[in-house]
């Protein structure tokens, strides 16, 4: 079984169209969106979910130009439930949840050929690339915006919860209904006329309700007037429940109609009705209601399925929700008409939770498997599906009968497992709200603009909104990094008034007499920039004469270690660091920078050595390397050192980068000479060292925090080997177990700079040594 990230990547691997059916490939936008989704799936953080929303809105421009036209709509959802959700008994995050739903749908589309065919047959776009493009567009709208109406349900639920806390459940309790609904959902005459032209077979379209009921009539055959009546009744007369799905559909419709040149189509109407149906509409007591088949409404079918299955890594706000355990990750196996999901729970839960104190919704372990295989599956696919599938071991709790949300045309298998979750401990972090990040990114762009005006050959677009998506994200990534950079010098920022010392002069920290924080942070900024460029498909290269040619080829001469940068380029990193303080203070929501010694983990340096050439599978060796590194990460601030020779050294560095660790390079020659020497050594040893191998080595070295040359012209390799052993606390060695030694006339071993010599030196110095066995030719 695979992770959602691995499963989702297939969609982008096969996608050839990203910016429209008449452009066969816009690789930058495609890579930006894929990178944003991958980053979010690795972190689960809201600020990374925000970048997914931004990429989608920038690519498709469904609300007008770019992200700014829908900024408030999305960010207010997150802000509102953050501040209001704690007043409820049960409530979990919907902002990041929607991005998970988006990614899960992409994974199902990529791996389930039956669903792809159903979508293609339903919409008939022609070739697979065009189908994938339009699926991405309309599925993105459905999934990312399906919960934007949740604040309406929150307001209703808060009053209900308040009354029940005081008087208990009582028919005499107050409940909220929303006034002025007819004006809120009304459509002006021009919009109504355009809708009549688009849907000539429909009745008048004076309200959004009429439009929604028409869409349900066309796709599912629901009687239009009956649906209109139920929509109004559920909003104005509902005591126990307010359907956020209805308000999500209404808000999205209003937003679409606010765009000057927007033209409604049946596809957009399918988006709206899919959102309307996803929560509880098929439970309305309306004529002709029934489970939805994929052939009737593919977008609705998929949203209901993914929305129900997304039951992991959801931040809890409500009192009971905070107490309920929830899976922190999943593993997937998707094929034609088959989905197998394993929900992974933190292994500590059984020890720390008492079953008797948990809510009825989820009782962990022995009962949870029964719940998801029984009630959970039955709610999606119906009780008949459970009864017809003896492979599902458990029966329904209390023998409840569920009609099901969707027609069961797939095999759905759900499991649970335990796996220890690695904790990221942080005492206090900066308040990285979405308002901060987007506005901060614009300030960074303005600052960079002002600086570059004085540089020959520099051209930067004055308007942030007109920047290519790649450069907008670059500024946002810089803004996101401010939190980590401040933490490195014992600071954080927040818009709250807190009882910590306020920093009034950041330069006193940056230019500290006891520590060169400026140089350190500049190095960190360069490494961040290098990793960003590499993740977007850029490479090291010098074969260009203009910025336009450089950007077209996606090559850059500055993808090198910080030490090799010209002073002009180093000054750009310094600009970012020195601008942190002034840019944060320019934000409108009263941001302050506070000083707080955070009690860092003890620092430990791990050296990596090993053979240049071995015949074992590198994946298994990488797993072992990461296992040892992760052991030390739990309790230490880990720095990895290596000489970056071909083979094991570079493999260890690669693993360290994968884990987000700081890496230092200690090389025996100057940079260019060493790369040449590594290539020649490989050729002498009978191994092909290709241009791709050299480029990979350059890219690895460019990500190092320090690239230091150990100067010893006579014993260069021996000196470098001894240097990293002397500096390290722990040695990880990829070794074949053979002690190859040479002795001098006094019968003392000679340091040849080889793997065994490093192991021997470390053991003689009583340093911890971890050996990972390998085989050599």
Map each language-model feature to its residues.
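Phosphate/oxyanion-binding active-site loops and adjacent basic polyanion-contact surfaces
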Residues: 90-109, 240-248, 471-474, 569-576, ...
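Acidic/His-rich, divalent-metal-binding segments that scaffold phosphate/diphosphate chemistry
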Residues: 2-186, 203, 210, 218-219, ...
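Active-site-adjacent bridging/hinge elements
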Residues: 67-82, 214-228, 452-461, 549-559
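Alpha-helical propensity feature that highlights long, continuous alpha-helices across diverse contexts
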Residues: 374-599
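Short, well-structured alpha-helical segments
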Residues: 95, 99, 136, 140, ...
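Acidic/glycine-enriched connector segments
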Residues: 598-776
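Divalent metal-dependent catalytic cores for phosphoryl transfer on phosphate-bearing substrates
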Residues: 128-331
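C-terminal effector/catalytic modules and regulatory tails appended to multi-domain proteins
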Residues: 1-75, 291-296, 300, 306-309, ...
């Amino acid at each position: 079984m695979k992770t959602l990230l691995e499963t989702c990547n297939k969609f982008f691997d096969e996608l050839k169209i990203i910016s429209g059916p008449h452009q066969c490939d816009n690789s930058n936008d495609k890579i930006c969106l894929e990178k944003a989704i991958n980053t979010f799936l690795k972190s689960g953080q809201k600020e990374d979910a925000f970048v997914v929303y931004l990429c989608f809105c920038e690519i498709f421009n469904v609300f007008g130009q770019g992200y700014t036209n829908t900024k408030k709509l999305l960010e207010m959802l997150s802000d509102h439930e953050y501040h209001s959700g704690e007043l409820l008994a049960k409530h979990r995050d919907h902002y990041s949840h929607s991005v998970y739903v988006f990614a899960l749908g992409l994974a199902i589309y990529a791996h389930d050929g039956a669903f792809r065919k159903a979508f293609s047959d339903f919409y008939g776009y022609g070739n697979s690339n065009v189908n994938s493009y339009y699926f991405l567009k309309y599925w993105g709208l459905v999934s990312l915006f399906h919960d934007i109406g949740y604040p309406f349900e929150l307001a209703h639920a808060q009053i209900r919860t308040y009354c029940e806390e005081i008087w208990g459940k009582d028919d005499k309790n107050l409940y909220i209904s929303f006034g002025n609904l007819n004006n809120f959902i009304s459509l002006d005459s021009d919009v109504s006329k355009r809708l009549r032209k688009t849907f000539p077979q429909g009745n008048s379209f004076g309200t959004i309700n009429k439009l929604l009921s028409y869409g349900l009539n066309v796709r599912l055959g629901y009687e239009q007037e009956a649906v209109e009546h139920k929509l109004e009744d559920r909003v104005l007369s509902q005591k126990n429940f307010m359907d956020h799905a209805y308000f999500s559909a209404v808000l999205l419709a209003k937003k679409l109609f606010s765009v000057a040149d927007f033209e409604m189509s049946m596809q957009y109407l399918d988006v709206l009705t899919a959102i309307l149906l996803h929560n509880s509409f098929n439970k309305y007591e309306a004529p002709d209601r029934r489970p939805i088949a994929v052939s009737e409404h593919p977008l609705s079918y998929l949203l209901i399925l993914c929305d129900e299955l997304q039951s992991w890594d959801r931040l809890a706000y409500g009192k009971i929700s905070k107490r309920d355990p929830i899976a922190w990750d999943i593993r997937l196996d998707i094929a034609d008409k088959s989905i197998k999901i394993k929900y992974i729970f933190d292994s500590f839960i059984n020890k720390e939770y008492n079953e008797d104190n948990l809510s009825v919704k989820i009782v962990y372990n022995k009962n949870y498997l029964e719940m998801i295989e029984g009630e959970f599956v039955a709610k999606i696919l119906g009780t008949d599906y459970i009864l017809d599938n003896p492979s599902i071991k458990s029966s329904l709790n209390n023998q409840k009968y569920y009609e099901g949300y969707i027609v069961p045309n797939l095999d759905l298998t759900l499991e649970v497992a335990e796996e220890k979750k690695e904790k990221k401990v942080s005492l206090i972090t900066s308040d990285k709200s979405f308002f901060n990040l987007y506005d901060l990114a614009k300030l960074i762009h303005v600052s960079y603009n002002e600086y570059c005006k004085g540089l020959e050959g520099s051209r930067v677009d004055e308007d942030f909104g007109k920047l290519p998506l790649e450069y907008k994200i670059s500024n946002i990534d810089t803004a996101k990094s401010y939190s980590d950079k401040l933490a490195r010098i014992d600071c954080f920022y927040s818009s709250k008034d807190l009882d910590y010392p306020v920093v009034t002069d950041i330069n006193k920290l940056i230019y500290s007499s006891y520590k060169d924080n400026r140089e350190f942070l500049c190095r960190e900024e360069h490494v961040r920039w290098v990793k960003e460029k590499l993740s977007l498909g850029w490479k090291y290269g010098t074969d260009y004469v203009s910025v336009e040619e450089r950007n077209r080829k996606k090559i850059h001469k500055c993808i090198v270690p910080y030490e090799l940068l010209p002073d002009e380029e180093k000054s750009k990193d310094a600009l970012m660091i020195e601008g942190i303080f002034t840019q944060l203070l320019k934000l409108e929501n009263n941001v302050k920078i506070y000083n707080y010694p955070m009690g860092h983990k003890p620092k430990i340096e791990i050296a990596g050595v090993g053979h240049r050439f071995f015949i074992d599978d590198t994946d298994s060796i990488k797993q072992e390397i990461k296992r040892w590194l992760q052991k030390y990460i739990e309790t230490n601030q880990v720095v990895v050192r290596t000489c970056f020779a071909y083979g094991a050294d570079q493999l260890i560095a690669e693993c360290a980068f994968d884990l987000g660790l700081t890496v230092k390079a200690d090389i025996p020659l100057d940079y260019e000479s060493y790369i040449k020497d590594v290539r020649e050594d490989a050729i002498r040893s009978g191994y092909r060292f290709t241009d791709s191998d050299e480029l990979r080595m350059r890219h690895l070295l460019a990500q190092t925090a320090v690239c230091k040359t150990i100067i010893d012209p006579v014993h260069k390799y021996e000196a470098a080997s001894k240097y990293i052993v002397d500096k390290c606390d722990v040695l990880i060695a990829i070794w074949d177990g053979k002690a190859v030694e040479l002795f001098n006339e006094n019968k003392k071993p000679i340091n040849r700079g080889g793997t065994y010599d490093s192991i021997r030196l470390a053991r003689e110095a009583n340093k911890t040594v971890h050996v990972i066995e390998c085989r050599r030719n």
